[in-house]
Amino acid sequence: MGGGSDGDCIDNHVVTVIAGSGDSDIWLYSLQRNTLTRLTTEQGNKMGPLWTPDGKRVVYSAATRSHGMNVMWIPVDGGGAQQVLWSGSESPMLIPTSLSPDGKLLLIDRLDAGGRGFDEWVLPMAGERQAHPLLQSEFSEQWGVVSPNGFWLAYVSDETGSSEVYVQSFPELGNRVQISELGGFEPAWSRSGHELFYRTGDKVMVVPVETEKHFRAGTPQALFEDHYDYSDYDIALDGAHLLMIKGQNESSPTHLNVVLNWPEEWKRARP
């Protein structure tokens, strides 16, 4: 599946799903009707699908043998062909991770040419669309996601020797805060911006946060623990459901799990 996680959900009814053996494609899955509609048809493996804020397009990356890595988008109503936003053929991997709330900036995980680690890049969605690095160092920085109010960036860095979740101001970086304590990856903001989720091992963690004039974070708490064969997930618009991906076995199709009802102690701990 796909999105700021691979279960990106523009509303509570339709999510993007990546499926296929060999070349993969992006499909739209209706939670209400339990139906799949194919969105992409070109050759190559697709990664990182994201809905644009207006719900009219899906952004994704595609890896092909002839054209390398490209970041693209496609209308979801079938009214037009896919369009290349950024050609990054010199990089072995590009993965869109987040769009700013106004849809003007796209964050992309870019694997360096030597394959040593990821850097976080930004692609303006208007004008000449010249991508530039946002977080780039000898360490790996990835999984960048912008907060719902557009003021903060959550991401993962391995600068301490293990992957940890951090938050900095955005788009001008500064005021960095470490969020995870014992490892973390794949951060995701709640739609309200009052919680920050991340994963560590088989646990989904949640942290109460304040994101208005200043950023403040509470103590991470384990929301639940379960084994999921795929790491990607997303938070529903109502903030009360998580969409997870769980493989049944190697020969059967993947199914979606909707996790309901946060623990009562977490509800009481919210600011």
Q: What function would you assign to each model-found segment?
A:
Residues 1-18, 43-63, 88-111, 134, ...:
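Conserved beta-propeller blade repeats
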Residues 18-38, 47-48, 54-57, 61-86, ...:
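Beta-propeller blade-edge and WD-like acidic-aromatic loop motif
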